[in-house]
Amino acid sequence: MPIIAAKPMTAATDAGLPVTKMVLVSAVALIDRDGRVLLAQRPEGKAMAGLWEFPGGKIESGETPEAALIRELHEELGIDTAASCLAPLSFASHSYAATQTHPAFHLLMMLYVCRRWQGRP
């Protein structure tokens, strides 16, 4: 089978948008015993306020995606879980154009599933 050379990836992705910053995020689909999935609504004052999303947040320097989720779930929802309860599910990669209030960036999000945690979100 012949090998086909692909164009190398550059900072200009998707629709050719220049990317100034890469944002690494981890998020989780929390699924309870009844099969319900918890979604969070983005707060006023943040980009894309009012939209719904999976809980999670930015991965800090030196932090694994799992550690970021454990930290974010504790900070945002007051629940605790372990890395062994986080199952990788998928990822998303998307470029966002600059707006009047935010510079262009590329989001790379790792998505996990979690069915076991302590506390009530």
Describe the residue ranges of each PLM region.
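Conserved N-terminal beta-strand and adjoining loop/helix that marks the start
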Residues: 6, 12-37, 58
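Conserved Nudix-box catalytic region and its N-terminal flanking loop in Nudix hydrolases
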Residues: 36-75, 80
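Active-site-adjacent beta-strand/loop module that shapes the phosphate/pyrophosphate-binding cleft
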Residues: 23, 32, 90-121
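N-terminal acidic, proline/glycine-rich, low-complexity intrinsically disordered segments
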Residues: 1-5
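Short, solvent-exposed loop/helix junctions and linker helices
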Residues: 31, 59-63, 67, 102, ...
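A short coil-to-beta-strand element that immediately follows conserved catalytic motifs
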Residues: 80-90
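Structural motif
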Residues: 37, 49, 86, 106-111
